[in-house]
Amino acid sequence: MSDIRPTYIAESRILGCLFGQAIGDAMGMPSELWPKRRIINHFGWIERFLPGPKENIAACEFRAAEFTDDTHQCIALMDALDENNGVTDPLAIARHILLWARRCQAFEKNILGPTSKASLIALEQGQPLDEIAANGVTNGAAMRVAPMGCRLPTEDRAFFIEQVRLSCLPTHKSDIAIAGAVVIAW
């Protein structure tokens, strides 16, 4: 595998990407999973950090300025890449996501999306990654992958796509989920 450790410039881009994701995620958290009309009726325009409202089962336990599992999984992905000197190892990514999920009780608090939850439970119970069904048609992989676009070289499109695909495998193996992640990372 190629070494894709980031340069100083790439590190700055990755940090900017992570900060942007965390801030945007925390800003949007109160309206998580709500349709546009409900968001407008409840909040009007969201222009500052707000706590998750008690009426929103997806956000009711979040404090103002707290980001969601999307950013936590993004950080777990970056930790796995750093641990492996830039090599995209799906099992290392899964391990880091599971460490975060257990640390914050993501399974018990129902923080994870349905696809991530099912895949991570299967992995934790010892099911091999290649035996987990490719049923992840949700957007969880796309939500965590943006910094890979700052890190990966783009000259070799096939290599780029393969690295993003590998990053998706722990939770989202379907073609549509992988395609969405590639678009975000690109």
Question: What is each PLM-predicted segment?
Answer:
Residues 1-186:
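Structured, active/binding-site neighborhoods that engage oxygen-rich ligands
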